[in-house]
C-alpha cells in the first residue's frame, strides 16, 4: 500500500486552491413565485429599483412597480405566457428607454418603439428614458406663438399656443379624434413635428387614421405610437410616456412638436387594472390613489422651454431658439359627465378644454364645440393679430344666441334688436360648421369672419351660408391671391387689409351667385 506524504497532500491542496476559478457573474437574480394576468411576483432581487427593467428567460422583459419587503411585483412588457414559477429573473440596472429622433417620423411603432408598419427597421441613433422629469419653472417660457388647428371654432374662440396643454373632452362619437387628426393635418406648412399616441383603440380604427395621415401627406412629419386594445395593459400604460419622450427630442433641440394622446381615459383604465392586480388599495371609482400623478407627470412634460435651456441641452449647438411640446390629451366622458374622477383630474391639470357635446353633434353642428364651457387659459396671448382682432365678438354672439334661443321658444313677439341678435347668432353658428379633413388657413378664416363681423351675412339665407363660404373663398384665391398670401405670411391686421377685405366681399356679393 502506497504511503501518502503529508507534505505532498498539503502541496496538492494548495495547488487546487490556486487553480480554483472564483470568478462569478455579479447578477442580482431572483425566482418567479407567481405569474398571473401579466403580473409577476419575484422572490429575491433585493437591489431592484422602482421602474427598473427586469429580464426573464426567453428574452422577455418586465418593469418593477411594487418593491415589497421580501418580493418584487413586476409588470410584463409583452407576452407572459412563456413565464413559469421557478424561472430566474435578473436585474438589468437600466430604466426603460425608447428610440428617439427624426428617423421615427413617418413610422408606426409600438409602445416600446419597435416598428410595426412593415417598412423595415428604424435606425435611430439615440434612445431616451420613457420616464423623465418635466422642465423646471426657470427653464420655461410663456406661451406666445400659435398652433393653428385649422378649425374656425377653435382658432377664434379657444386658441391653442405652442407649449400649451389643451384637453379635448366629450362623449364617444362626438368628433374628438377627428379634431385631433385635423390639427395634425393642419401643421403641414408650420414646421411642427407631430406624435399621435393611440391607446386602447381597435386596430381597424388606428389603420384608418394612419391611412388618412398618409393620404394627406401628414405622416411624413408624424410618428404614430400604437398600444391597441388587444395589447397588454402594461403597454397601454407605457405608450403615452414613450410618445412624450419622442416629442421631447424635438422640444429640447429648439424645435416645435405636437402630441395627441388618444385617449387618456383608456390609459387610466389600464393603470387601474395593473394596480388592482398588484394588490394596491383602490380609491374612488376603484382607481389607485396616484392616478392624478399618472396624468400630471405626463402632461407637465408638455411645455415651452427658453433659449437658455435649449442651448445648455445641445451644448451650445442650437442658440437663440426656444422649443415647445404642445399636448392635446383626449378624455372620453360617459353621458356628458365631466365631474367624474379622471375628467376632473385632467381638466385641473391642463390649460383649458374643448368640450364636444353629443346633442350639438347630432343636430349637425360639427365640430360640436360647446362655446360656453370650452376655454383656453393661455392661448389668447398666442393668437395671431388678425384672428385676435376679428374673433372678439364671436364667442359673445354665440353665447347670447344660445341664451336668447332658449328664451325665444316661449316668447311670441320679439323686439327688433332681439330678432337681429338671433339672426346673427344663427349665421355665426352656421359659419362655425366645418367639414372633416378640411383645415382652413389664417387667411381663409380671416376672410369669412370679417364678412360675418361686418354684417354682410345678414342678407344671405342661413341654409346658403356654407355654399357662400365655399364660393367666396374660391373667388378670393382667384381674384385676391396676393391679399390671401399677405395675410398668411404676416397675420397682421390694419386699415389697408380691412379695406381690401371690405371691397372684396362687397364685389363678390354684387357680382356672384352661389
Curated annotation (Swiss-Prot):
GO molecular function: ADP binding; ATP binding; proton-transporting ATP synthase activity, rotational mechanism
Binding residues annotated for ATP, in chain numbering: 170-177
Compartments where located: Cell inner membrane
EC number(s) given by UniProt: 7.1.2.2
CDD domains hit by this protein: ATP-synt_F1_alpha_C, ATP-synt_F1_alpha_N, F1-ATPase_alpha_CD
Annotated site residues (Required for activity) in this chain: 374
Membrane topology classification: Peripheral membrane protein
Record's catalysed reaction(s): ATP + H2O + 4 H(+)(in) = ADP + phosphate + 5 H(+)(out)
InterPro entries tied to this protein: ATP_synth_asu-like_sf, ATP_synth_asu_C, ATP_synth_asu_C_sf, ATP_synth_F1_a_nt-bd_dom, ATP_synth_F1_asu, ATPase_a/bsu_AS, ATPase_F1/V1/A1_a/bsu_N, ATPase_F1/V1/A1_a/bsu_N_sf
GO cellular component: a single term: plasma membrane
Keywords on record: ATP synthesis, ATP-binding, Cell inner membrane, Cell membrane, CF(1), Hydrogen ion transport, Ion transport, Membrane, Nucleotide-binding, Translocase, Transport
Pfam families membership: ATP-synt_ab, ATP-synt_ab_C, ATP-synt_ab_N
Top-level enzyme category: translocase
Function description: Produces ATP from ADP in the presence of a proton gradient across the membrane. The alpha chain is a regulatory subunit.
Subunit structure: F-type ATPases have 2 components, CF(1) - the catalytic core - and CF(0) - the membrane proton channel. CF(1) has five subunits: alpha(3), beta(3), gamma(1), delta(1), epsilon(1). CF(0) has three main subunits: a(1), b(2) and c(9-12). The alpha and beta chains form an alternating ring which encloses part of the gamma chain. CF(1) is attached to CF(0) by a central stalk formed by the gamma and epsilon chains, while a peripheral stalk is formed by the delta and b chains.
Family statement: Belongs to the ATPase alpha/beta chains family.
Official protein name in the record: ATP synthase subunit alpha
Origin species: Psychrobacter sp. (strain PRwf-1)
Lineage of the organism: Bacteria, Pseudomonadati, Pseudomonadota, Gammaproteobacteria, Moraxellales
Name of the coding gene: atpA
